């Protein structure tokens, strides 16, 4: 959520930065400014009325103490004025509440401001490739490389038909070595991240609306999430939601920062806007597994922590010897809550292209304002909002897809197991 004070003081600058997001969306600050002005006027009116009401109460007590007749005309006149003020104050209360709710609704619908260092652009075509790694692992010959779902079906480790039978489209069942590979990837990733200082969390995978509001999925993306009928509970789209919201409405000590968590969870998404895209395989499912990295940090350290987050996600791909590239997103391709974002894209030889496998975002204080996560420094007055960051470390299904394609040996029809996973799987080939 954006800072209302900033919007009031610098509306033109805020408007210009919002307009950088492009994508055909428009963000009108005028309704916010108008309601904020009306709310402020009501607050001022209430302050004046409350002050006069308090003054009358004291005045009545003083006059009676000085001998005035409690039933006399002077006291009765003051009491009538006091009663009138109470009625006016009571009338103001719902008006202020309504204005506050209107203002909150409009503020929650505004996306985050792009970071000043985020490249300006209109769409993903304007994103900037900042790094490419692993060219030595690219296959010299891609003839005979099958898409990962065909490899999985041939090996009997991906069963799409039964996944659809049990649920519906965009569900799969992992069988035998496929299930073992998924589990091995989860354990490998968690151990690597714990080894560099992340604390593991196993959070709820059902969360309430306040949690989704805090991290920015609600109200804008309600249709992309699965809600439990009859309960204020939603299946999580990412572990970012429960892990970040562990600290909702809390004031942390400065000494606790930075907080670094990793978490494995199943994730659930409707993929409402992807009809007809990636209908086969592991790339775009309604249910998938992911290891997530989440950080809560001091504002002045968030840029450096962001770079470290990207490096931690990269380390997994490097250990697996999977070719990838790092892309910096432009303003027109930023996610709703992100101020700055890097995507890691892994090489899929069957498609002869790179596909996103991790999105590492710095939200600045956008989520912290929504979730009310602050920190306090000893000896100093007041509190500050933390900066939040998160990224996949990594998406398990997409990692498996990349392994199946990059390690597939057409001559034997087998898939070599990456060296770092062989101890987990107790085998060299699938």
From Swiss-Prot:
Pathway: Aminoacyl-tRNA biosynthesis; selenocysteinyl-tRNA(Sec) biosynthesis; L-seryl-tRNA(Sec) from L-serine and tRNA(Sec): step 1/1. Its main location: cytoplasm. Gene3D superfamilies: Bira Bifunctional Protein, Domain 2, Serine-tRNA synthetase, tRNA binding domain. CDD domains: SerRS_core. Catalyzes the attachment of serine to tRNA(Ser). Is also able to aminoacylate tRNA(Sec) with serine, to form the misacylated tRNA L-seryl-tRNA(Sec), which will be further converted into selenocysteinyl-tRNA(Sec). NCBIfam families: serS. This is Serine--tRNA ligase. It comes from Synechocystis sp. (strain ATCC 27184 / PCC 6803 / Kazusa).
């Amino acid at each position: 959520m954006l800072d209302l004070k900033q919007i009031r003081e610098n509306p033109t600058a805020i408007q210009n930065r919002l307009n950088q997001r492009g994508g055909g969306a428009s963000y009108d600050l005028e309704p916010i400014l108008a309601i904020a002005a009306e709310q402020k006027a009501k607050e001022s009116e209430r302050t004046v009325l409350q002050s006069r009401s308090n003054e009358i109460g004291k005045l009545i007590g003083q006059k009676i103490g000085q001998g005035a007749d409690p039933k006399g005309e002077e006291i009765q006149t003051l009491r009538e004025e006091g009663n009138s003020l109470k009625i006016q104050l009571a009338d103001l209360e719902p008006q202020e509440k309504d204005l506050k709710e209107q203002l909150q609704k409009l503020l929650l619908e505004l996306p985050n401001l792009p970071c000043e260092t985020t490249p300006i652009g209109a769409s993903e075509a304007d994103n900037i490739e900042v790094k490419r790694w692993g060219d030595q692992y690219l296959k010299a010959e891609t003839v005979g490389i099958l898409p990962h779902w065909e490899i999985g079906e041939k090996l009997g480790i991906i069963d799409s038909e039964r996944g659809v039978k049990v649920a519906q489209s965009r569900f799969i069942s992992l069988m035998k070595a496929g299930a073992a590979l998924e589990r091995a990837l989860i354990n490998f990733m968690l151990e690597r991240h714990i080894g560099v200082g992340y604390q593991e969390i196993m959070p709820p995978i059902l969360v309430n609306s306040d949690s989704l509001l805090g991290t920015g999925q609600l109200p804008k993306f309600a249709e992309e999430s699965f809600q439990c009928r009859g309960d204020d509970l939603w299946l999580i789209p990412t572990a970012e939601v429960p892990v970040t919201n562990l600290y909702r409405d809390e004031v942390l000590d400065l000494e606790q920062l930075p907080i670094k968590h990793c978490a494995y969870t199943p994730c659930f998404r409707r993929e409402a806007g992807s009809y007809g895209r990636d209908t086969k395989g592991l790339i775009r499912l309604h249910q998938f597994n992911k290891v997530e990295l989440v950080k809560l940090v001091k504002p002045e350290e968030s840029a450096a922590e962001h770079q470290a987050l990207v490096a931690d996600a990269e380390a997994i791909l490097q250990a697996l010897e999977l070719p990838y590239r790092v892309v910096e997103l432009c303003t027109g391709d930023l996610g709703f809550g992100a101020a700055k974002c890097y995507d890691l894209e892994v090489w899929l030889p069957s498609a002869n292209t790179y596909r996103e496998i991790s999105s590492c975002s710095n939200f600045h204080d956008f989520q912290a304002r929504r979730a009310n996560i602050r920190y306090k420094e000893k000896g100093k007055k007041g509190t500050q909002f933390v900066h939040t960051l998160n990224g996949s470390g990594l998406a398990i299904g997409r990692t498996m897809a990349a392994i199946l394609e990059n390690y597939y040996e057409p001559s034997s029809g087998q898939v070599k197991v990456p060296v770092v996973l062989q101890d987990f799987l107790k085998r060299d080939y699938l």
